[in-house]
Amino acid sequence: MLLDTIHSRQDLLDIPEDQLGTLCGEIRQFLVQNVSRTGGHLASNLGIVETTVAIHRVFDTSRDRLVFDVGHQCYVHKMLTGRMDRFDTLRQRGGLSGFPKPCESVHDAFIAGHASNAVSVALGMARARTMEGADYHVLALMGDGALTGGLAYEGFNNAGASREPMIVLLNDNGMSITPNVGAISRYLAQARLRPKYLDLKLWYRQTTAKSAFGRRLYALTHKVKEHMRRSILGTTLFENLGFTYLGPVDGHDISRIEMLLKTAVALHEPVLIHLITKKGRGYAPAEKTPQEFHGIGKFDPETGLSETVSVPTFSDIFGQELGRMAASDKTVCAITAAMQHGTGLDQFAADFPSRFFDVGIAEGHAVCMAAGLAKQGMKPVAAIYSTFLQRAYDMLLHDVALQQLHVVLAVDRCGIVGEDGDTHQGMFDVGYLRQVPGMKIFSPASFAELREDLHTAFYACTGPAAIRYPRGAEGCYQVSASQTCIREGYTCTIICYGTMVNAVLSAADTMQAAGYRPEILKLRTISPIDWSTIEASARKTKHVFVFEETSDRECLADEIFAHLIEHGIPAVCCKRNLGRGFIPHGAPAALLAAAGLDADALTKLMQEELS
C-alpha cells in the first residue's frame, strides 16, 4: 500500500501525481477501519482528505503554521505527520487526541476545539512572523460552519486590513456561500489563475514598484481592472473585507488545490481559497447520512451501523419535556447554537418551527436574543453545551442578569464529557454561573428531577435560571427527591449534587457495610444553597465531605466550608473535585477514576479521614 510508504513529507512528495487518488482511497479506508474501533469524527475527515494531502505537498508544517478551526478534521493531518501507528489509541486516555495538540507534535501549531477563531489566531502568527523577520507561511483551515460565528468576521475584517500574507482555506461541504453567476464568472475566475496571467501580474507589480511613477501607474491600472471585474462579477464578502478570493474550486482535485496554494503564496497578501467538498466522501453510509457520522461511537465498518446500544439521555429527556410544555404554552421557545441534534431538540424543531431558533455557532448572540424574547414576554430556553456557554459570559451578566430577565439556560454536557478532551469538558460552569447575580442553578441527578426542574425554572422563577446536566444516561439514582437529605446518618456528612450522587451512594453503601453511617445531602439547587440543612447536619456529624464533578476553582466546597467557619460550626472539612488543571481525553469512567471521584476512591478517602 502507498500509505505504508509514507514516513515523512518527502515520501508524500515522491508519490507520482497519477497515484495520489489511490493514496487518498487508502487514507479513507484507514480512517473508516480505525474510527470504527475507537469512535470519533469521521465524516468531516473523509471530506478533507485531498485538501490535507495538497497542503502537506506544498507546505512543511514543521515550520509553516497550519491552524485548524474547531480541529476535529485533523485526522488526515495527523496521519501524514508520523502518527498513523497510534490511531488505535485515538481519543483514549493517554492516547492520540482527536484534536490538534502542540504537545503531541511539532506539526500541530495550535490547540483547537471551539469554532470561528482560526483567522484571528493565524493573523497573530502572521504578525509575529513579520515582527521577527521570519519567512514561514501561515494557513487557517476552517469549515463553512465556522462562518456562522461572529468571531470569524472580526478576524477577517482585521486580517484583510492588515495586508499580512496569510492563507485561509474554506472547506465548504454544505452551506452556499458564493452565488453562481454563470459561465462568464467561471471563465474569468479560471483565467485569473492561469500561470501565464499570474507571472505577468507579478512581473508588472515588481516592475512598477521601482519608481514613484510606476507605483502611481500600478495603483491606477489596478483600480480600473478591479472596477471592470466587479462590474461583471460583483464582489464576495471576503473581497470586501480585504482578501483576494480564489475559487470556488473542487476540494477533491489535488493538483488544482496545489496550484491555488502556490498562487496564494505568490500573491503575498491575505488570500481565501474556497473549496467545495463532500462530507463523508468515499464511504457510502457517511455520504448518505453525514450528520450521523460527524461524531460517532464504535460501528460496523461494513454496514455503518452503530455498535452502541441506544439509551435515553438527559438531552433526550430535556427535548421531550420541553416539547410537552410548548404544546400547552405558546410562549415557550427554544434556541440553540448549531447543536440542534446534540441538545435533543430535533423533534421540537419539527413540531414548533416558528418557535425554534438555531442561530449557528453564536452563543453570545443566542443569549442576547433570549434576553430580547424574555423582555417581550416570551419564555425562552437557550440550550448550549457547558464548554460553549463560556463564550457568552458577558451576555449572561450584562444582557440577562442586569435586568433579571427570565431566561432559562439548559446547560448540556456538564462535568466530564470524555473522549473529546480538555476543550470540551464541562468543568467550569459551576464557577462562572454562580457568579451571576440572581441566577438560580438546578443540578438534577435523574430524568425525573430534570423534568421537574424544567417546570420550576419556567413557572416558579422570575429571573435567570440554569439547569445543568451531564452527557449520557442517568445512573442508579432515578427518583426525584424534594428534600436535601436523602439518607440519614451520624458518622459524617457527604454533600454532592447532580449525577455525582451515583458514586456517593455506592461509596456510602460500602461505608455502611463497614460500620459507618454516613448522612447524604444531595443539593437540588447549588444557587441558592440549602444552608439550614447543611448547618444542622454538620453540627450533628462534625465531619463534612463535599464531592463535586467540577473544577476546584470556585467550587461549592469552598463556600460551604467558609460558611461553616463564619457561623461557628465546628467540623472537619474535606473536599474532592476535578482539580485546578484541564482534564484530557479518555473514557468518562477512567477520567473520574483518575481524579479520585469513583466510588472506590471516595470510600478509601472517607475511611482514611474517619479512622
Residue ranges and their predicted role:
Residues 41-162, 314, 332, 336-337, ...:
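Cofactor-binding active-site loop characterized by glycine-rich and histidine/acidic residues
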Residues 89-121, 131-135, 161-292, 305-350, ...:
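Thiamine diphosphate
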Residues 442, 457-459:
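Catalytic cores of secreted or luminal carbohydrate-active enzymes
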Residues 294-303:
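Surface-exposed loop/turn segments flanking beta-strands in extracellular/periplasmic regions
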Residues 1-80, 237-259, 267, 271-277:
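N-terminal amphipathic, basic-rich helices that act as targeting or association modules
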Residues 138, 142-155, 344, 356, ...:
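Extended, hydrophobic alpha-helical segments in both membrane/secreted and soluble proteins
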